[in-house]
């Protein structure tokens, strides 16, 4: 066996190493000479790229209807690959949302973990932005090219993507908002096999439902525990909301006065005044949870706490302990916006390629996709509060701002 070179070979004959390093190097060399297989085993067992990524398995999944890639044309191969990529993106989104859901499941939620939740939401945004770009690849498929193999897809549909349904469930989409596909009573029915038996997609969705409440549920629980101006009592929440709505009315009066100063005609001023008055009344009903007469007292109390927390965090975001909560809320809003844009872009791609014909799964096609983009919102309170926020000078003063500063423990 060739002798292993000493340290001087690598450092130069005239180089000097510190004595501890020289001793350590000699111990390592003696160990390798005594047990040469110890270092070699790592080399022979190192993973390679194609095994780690499972390249061959991935490249064997584009066989189409007959599981024979030789019978698949370039256009159909593109169609298959892009949809497979979407499913992989959905898998990553589900991982990030699940991690965030599990974080907010905790009570209390550790403040130092909020940054990781914000990163998860930002990653989901980036994935959706990347997925939107993939529609450009799909649009290289002409109408006639797609029609050559489209009929063979019937009754398959993108609606049957179990992972997309999982994302909706994990976020917390209300079943009452769901738009019927066109031929079944429940979205779960579309996931069954042709003979009505449960499929792998059905089992996946059922497992997601069994995994527990949604991200929105736990987010609302977290928000409802937020101290409002130092208090978590219902009376303190209502007191803050009434103070805030008074400030809103004062701000609207200021805007009316601006209209008068700019010489708007009296009828225009009155129309503007009536509009602002209606806005103020609607805002007060929303914040005090009086916008749903059918809700019971406990539900209204919870909604007041959640909505007060959103307004409070947004209005006083400069306070140190509110900075990360505000970042989380902003990232969630950005995430839902990205998903809505993805839905809208999906609809425009479909319209460009096949127009407004009936979908392969029996849906209204583009009309169905457009409706999902308009109606499928999970975090409605976050969107509504954007209409209610005030300029910084108009935000009411709070008494316990010091409660939201950084905490520095006294030295012993």
Swiss-Prot record:
Cofactor(s) the protein needs: heme
E.C. number: 1.13.11.11
Co-factor binding details: Binds 1 heme group per subunit.
Biochemical pathway: Amino-acid degradation; L-tryptophan degradation via kynurenine pathway; L-kynurenine from L-tryptophan: step 1/2
Residues that hold substrate according to the record: 79-83, 146, 150, 360
Known function: Heme-dependent dioxygenase that catalyzes the oxidative cleavage of the L-tryptophan (L-Trp) pyrrole ring and converts L-tryptophan to N-formyl-L-kynurenine. Catalyzes the oxidative cleavage of the indole moiety.
Name assigned to this protein: Tryptophan 2,3-dioxygenase
Organism: Sorangium cellulosum (strain So ce56)
Gene that this sequence comes from: kynA
